[in-house]
């Protein structure tokens, strides 16, 4: 929003603040000269004058970036971590079904684990709230290397009602993004007072209530804002109560669940003068989920009890920011921010430990993040310079215990060491503009330097319950820590084919630093019951950073009046993907220099694989009323994504095999109608997804004894393709009251999400039960009301 502020007085600053989102949508590809816009508010209870705002050209950027607004989320039925991405090409939320054993252990929580963007998922995609990264999903070291790319506690710490928009950055993150990730970023932006206030409207109150039949959930949300040009604030509260998300299988219904959540946000903006805008924000989120589900024996053929689980998720954040716009000879703007974030995840599970006994497993994950970020901008002739610095200190704890004290054979050690990690970074970028026969051409070089240092803490906690493992032994294995510096260049070429249509070619270097689960994830390290056959899974403090080279060509803008489109073709190459290698003390003595003497076989995290992914995306909207007055209000939306990817390990005899995290081809087509003045409207949207079967490999069971890797005989179930139709509508029944709703999966189609079901088999009764649990909801509906003053 700051790009709209350049060269404006305080009065104009405030006038445009609330309307910046609307201006952005309407003018993203406006002509190169300034455009005069007539804007009026539709939220006031009294007639208001039309404001005329002169907005400068908005910056055009290379790369695949998209935004989902709060209005988009409500229109499309996006009311949780996953459904907000319902129609977004190339982006899907991944997760595990309640009570399922697919990708989770009996004490692991169900739900969303993260996002998949163009075939990379979970911790390789940054997820943040106002630029503060949410915690990584926790690894499942306690199931040895079979747990690769599965997670015990996911990254869902949000309530969509709290956000004014969600920004999505596909591919490796840009140099200006402080949180580096090779898979992209999903950025949740909190609501602000400027979203609701302007000089003619100094108060706002909104109430929203919704019901969703897919999980019988009720939502009630309140947004209140007030203030003037100098001082203004906002308060947002959201309450949700629901049950289990229904599956669509006649033989096996979803396991019972009962959950509720509360979210609060308070933010104050103070503009003491024309040069400073100071914003203080506090936000809080808490969700509790109670559920119970079957517990199966190790063969997967007999249910020997019922597990009961309570999961609690909390997030608390504080931030203070200053936007300084002196417009002097040195800088145009300087934005600085400090922040703190605290998160907690607690899973308490009372579950069978055998056919005749029960235990309680306490699995926790706590983090604290402290950070700062500062960015400056300056225009010098044809040069648009930006630069910034950032730093973050993160502390993680992973308490884990069983009660009563388990036997030697069933004890589970703390899954990873507590850790301390600090990250420092800085970037410089220059957009150099040229006039080529009245067409703007820009060269955009940039570079980010990122440094991360991670060390374990409280190593004595890993020795709990062990008679052979000592703190000094763990310190020898992990105590050295891990650090790395990455130089990440980028280069883009942008050319305006017309004043409203741009093409670009872009290269970006990406980096993904190792996380605590990979560095210090451990299992069986303190065991000695198997003698010289004793094995363990261990992390690796010497891991290298995963890296990527990303190439993209795209076309974005308005090719003709009434048509907006974005298209991209890309190729990404990756190396140093982290996985697990098997070593024996007798066959690989050099790998056991720091390994405790009670362990004779290890599964150790290493930089094992390389991969590539290529694909294409297309999205856009057509307004037919631009050409035919009789169908004013009729529009169509479309989106398409296609990806292919393969990976290869360093094992002898291995070859490139389909990368299972790459999603199948997907298309979205919609037709909508909006009456004059948006008094009512309706839309029908169809989603088509191609079927796909994941390819199994023997990489996770390779003995690493010198023989060539053989092909796997495991046969994953094919996830069938599907077509699904959704119907949505709204009606402005009064000036301040709007009804909205939708019917989703109108034809009650039975289908599965490939990314959450790709490794399922039908070998055992439990496997077949998991397949039934993984079916997505059948026909459901949502109904909501908005009251705004």
Feature annotation, model-predicted:
Residues 82, 86-137:
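Extracytoplasmic beta-strand/coil segments of soluble accessory domains associated
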Residues 115-116, 132-170:
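Short acidic/polar hinge/loop motifs at secondary-structure boundaries
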Residues 135-138, 511, 575, 688-706, ...:
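C-terminal beta-signal and adjacent terminal beta-strands/loops
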Residues 152-206, 788:
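A beta-strand signature from Gram-negative outer-membrane beta-barrel systems
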Residues 211-241, 251-292, 310-325, 433, ...:
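Transmembrane beta-barrel wall of Gram-negative outer-membrane proteins
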Residues 255-257, 275-331, 342-366, 402, ...:
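Flexible loop and strand-edge segments within Gram-negative outer membrane beta-barrel domains
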Residues 303-327, 365, 415, 419-421, ...:
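Outer-membrane beta-barrel signature, preferentially recognizing the C-terminal barrel domain
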Residues 382, 433-438, 443, 450-452, ...:
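Gram-negative outer-membrane beta-barrel transporters
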């Amino acid at each position: 929003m700051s790009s709209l502020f350049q060269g404006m007085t305080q009065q104009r600053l405030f006038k445009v603040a609330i309307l910046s989102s609307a201006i952005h949508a309407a003018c993203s590809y406006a002509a190169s000269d300034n455009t005069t816009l007539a804007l009026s508010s539709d939220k006031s209870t009294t007639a208001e004058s039309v404001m005329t705002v002169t907005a400068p050209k908005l910056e055009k950027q290379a790369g695949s970036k998209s935004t989902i607004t709060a209005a988009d989320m409500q229109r499309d039925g996006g009311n949780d971590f996953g459904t907000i991405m319902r129609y977004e090409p190339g982006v899907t939320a991944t997760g595990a079904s309640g009570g399922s054993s697919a990708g989770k252990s009996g004490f692991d929580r169900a739900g969303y684990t993260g996002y998949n963007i163009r075939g990379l998922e979970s911790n390789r995609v940054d997820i943040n709230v106002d630029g503060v990264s949410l915690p990584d999903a926790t690894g499942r070291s306690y199931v040895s290397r079979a747990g690769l790319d599965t997670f015990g506690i996911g990254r869902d710490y949000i309530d969509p009602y709290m956000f004014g928009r969600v920004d999505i950055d596909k591919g490796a993150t840009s140099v200006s993004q402080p949180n580096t990730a090779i898979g992209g970023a999903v950025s949740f932006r909190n609501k602000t007072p400027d979203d609701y206030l302007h000089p003619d409207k100094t108060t706002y109150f909104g109430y929203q209530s919704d019901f969703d039949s897919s999980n019988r959930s009720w939502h009630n949300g309140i947004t209140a804002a007030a203030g003037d040009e100098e001082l203004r604030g906002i308060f947002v509260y959201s309450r949700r109560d629901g049950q289990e998300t229904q599956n669509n299988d006649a033989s096996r219904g979803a396991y019972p669940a009962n959950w509720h959540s509360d979210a609060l946000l308070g933010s104050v903006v103070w503009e003491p003068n024309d040069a400073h805008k100071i914003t203080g924000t506090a936000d809080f989120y808490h969700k509790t989920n109670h559920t119970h589900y079957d517990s199966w024996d190790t063969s997967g053929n007999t249910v020997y009890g019922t597990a009961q689980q309570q999961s609690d998720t909390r997030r608390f954040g504080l931030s203070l920011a200053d936007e300084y716009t002196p417009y002097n000879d040195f800088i145009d703007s300087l934005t600085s921010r400090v922040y703190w974030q605290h998160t907690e995840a607690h899973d308490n599970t009372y579950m069978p430990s055998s056919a005749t006994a029960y235990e309680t497993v306490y699995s926790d994950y706590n983090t604290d993040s402290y950070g700062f970020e500062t960015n400056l901008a300056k225009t010098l002739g044809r040069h648009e310079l930006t630069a910034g610095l950032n730093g973050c200190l993160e502390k993680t704890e992973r308490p884990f215990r069983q009660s009563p004290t388990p036997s030697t054979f069933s004890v589970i050690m703390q899954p990873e060491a507590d850790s301390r990690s600090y990250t420092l970074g800085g970037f410089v970028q220059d957009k150099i503009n040229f006039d080529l026969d009245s067409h703007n051409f820009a060269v955009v070089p940039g570079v980010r330097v990122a440094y991360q240092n991670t060390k374990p803490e409280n190593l004595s906690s890993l020795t709990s319950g062990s008679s052979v493992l000592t703190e000094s032994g763990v310190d020898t294995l992990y105590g050295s820590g891990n650090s790395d510096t990455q130089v990440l260049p980028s280069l883009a070429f942008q050319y305006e084919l017309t004043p409203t249509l741009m093409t670009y070619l872009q290269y970006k270097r990406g980096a993904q630093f190792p996380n605590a689960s990979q560095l210090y994830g451990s299992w069986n390290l303190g065991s000695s019951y198997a003698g010289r056959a004793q094995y363990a899974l261990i992390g690796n403090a010497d891991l290298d950073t995963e890296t990527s080279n990303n190439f993209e060509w795209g076309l974005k803008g308005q090719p003709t009046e009434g048509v907006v489109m974005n298209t991209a073709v890309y190729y990404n190459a990756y190396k140093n993907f982290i996985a697990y290698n098997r070593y024996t003390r007798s066959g690989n003595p050099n790998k056991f220099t720091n390994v405790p003497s009670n362990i004779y076989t290890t599964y150790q995290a290493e930089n094992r694989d390389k991969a590539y992914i290529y694909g294409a995306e297309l999205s856009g909207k057509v307004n037919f009323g631009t050409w035919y007055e009789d169908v004013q209000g009729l529009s169509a939306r479309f989106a398409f994504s296609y990806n292919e990817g393969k990976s290869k390990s360093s094992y002898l005899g291995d070859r490139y095999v389909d990368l299972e995290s790459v999603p199948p081809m997907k298309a979205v087509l919609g037709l909508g109608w909006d009456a004059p003045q948006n008094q009512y409207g309706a839309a029908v949207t169809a989603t088509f997804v191609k079927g796909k079967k994941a390819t199994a490999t023997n990489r996770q069971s390779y003995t690493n004894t010198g023989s060539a890797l053989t092909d796997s005989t495991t046969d994953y179930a094919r996830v069938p393709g599907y077509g699904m139709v959704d119907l949505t509508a709204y009606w402005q029944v009064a000036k301040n009251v709007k009804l909205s709703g939708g019917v989703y999966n109108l034809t009650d189609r039975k289908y599965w999400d490939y990314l959450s079901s790709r490794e399922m088999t039908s070998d055992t009764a439990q496997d077949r039960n998991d397949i039934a649990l993984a079916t997505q909801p059948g026909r459901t509906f949502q109904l909501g009301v908005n009251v705004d003053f």
